Amino acid sequence: MQRNFRKTFVGKVVSDKMDKTITVIVDIYKKDPLYGKRVKQSKKFHVHDENQEAKPGDLVNFMETRPLSKTKRFRLFKILYHSKSAN
């Protein structure tokens, strides 16, 4: 099945306390329409991590998928950077 049309995001893992699920925060910079200043906005996603590889602090790439639970609509695609912290 072709997966080219699914949305992908890059974010930082903030929690791995759930079974096969990680919480990832994605920072988005938007320009204020009136003043032109860049404003940082954050959004948290619950991402399915089948092999439980990602740890807090890791930079991950994840993609859209079918609904896996009430809150999970994304799955882990690739770990881009492993964090050095012991958490």
Swiss-Prot record:
GO molecular function ontology, one term from the record: structural constituent of ribosome
Listed GO CC annotations: cytosolic small ribosomal subunit
GO terms of biological process kind: translation
Keyword Translocase: no
CDD domains: Ribosomal_uS17 (cd00364)
SUPFAM superfamilies according to UniProt: Nucleic acid-binding proteins
InterPro entries, A to Z: NA-bd_OB-fold (IPR012340), Ribosomal_uS17 (IPR000266), Ribosomal_uS17_bact/chlr (IPR019984)
Keyword terms: Ribonucleoprotein, Ribosomal protein, RNA-binding, rRNA-binding
This protein's record includes keyword RNA-binding: yes
Known partners and oligomeric status: Part of the 30S ribosomal subunit.
Similarity section: Belongs to the universal ribosomal protein uS17 family.
Function according to Swiss-Prot or TrEMBL: One of the primary rRNA binding proteins, it binds specifically to the 5'-end of 16S ribosomal RNA.
NCBIfam families named in the record: PRK05610.1, uS17_bact
Xref: PANTHER family: 40S RIBOSOMAL PROTEIN S11 FAMILY MEMBER, SMALL RIBOSOMAL SUBUNIT PROTEIN US17M
Name of the protein described by the UniProt record: Small ribosomal subunit protein uS17
Species the sequence originates in: Aster yellows witches'-broom phytoplasma (strain AYWB)
